[in-house]
Regions:
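An N-terminal alpha-helical hairpin/helix-loop-helix interaction module that forms a charged
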Residues: 1-119, 138-146
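Active-site acidic-Proline motif in GNAT/NAT acetyltransferases
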Residues: 122
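Short hydrophobic alpha-helical segments that form membrane-spanning helices or hydrophobic packing faces
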Residues: 129-135
Length: 146
């Protein structure tokens, strides 16, 4: 079976993929309920541009450029789940876990042990983890995580 990288030249990149945005309602109860435990969440939402309808706007470029790991983790979660998770316990666990993962110091080369550690965190499934790996620019066997 060919590697996905064998098709790299066949795939045409989208124009301005970094400019893609999502809107997040900062008053969504699933987010506001976590402000007390995670002030970084409120600080992050308060610092975002507003779309004129009261929603915060997050772009891919903004997430990639963010240098603060905790804030980047929150932006990644907001990007991937702008309406929050269905289950409030999972939602709270995911916020806690992505912040913990972001604070881990490593060389961004994903090892099987790191993968097990990350996927073992409460509230972190493959969907959440894939976003963390992508926005934090992890590599798998020397290749960028998709």
């Amino acid at each position: 079976m060919k590697s996905i990288y064998a098709f790299e030249k066949s795939v045409h990149p989208f124009s301005d993929v970094m400019g893609q945005t999502v809107s997040v309602n900062p008053l969504n109860k699933k987010w506001t309920d976590l402000f007390v435990d995670y002030p970084i969440l409120k600080e992050t939402l308060d610092g975002l541009d507003n779309d004129g309808k009261g929603h915060c706007v997050i772009s891919r470029e903004m997430i990639f450029r963010e240098k603060d790991c905790r804030r980047k983790a929150i932006l990644t979660l907001l990007w991937g789940f702008p309406r929050g998770y269905r289950n409030s316990k999972t939602h709270k666990n995911a916020v806690k876990s992505v912040v913990e993962i972001a604070e881990e110091n490593n060389d961004k080369n994903l090892t099987p042990e790191m993968f097990k550690f990350m996927i073992g965190k409460a509230g972190v499934g493959l969907s959440t983890l894939s976003k963390i790996l992508y926005f934090f620019e992890y590599k798998v066997n020397g290749n960028p995580a998709l």
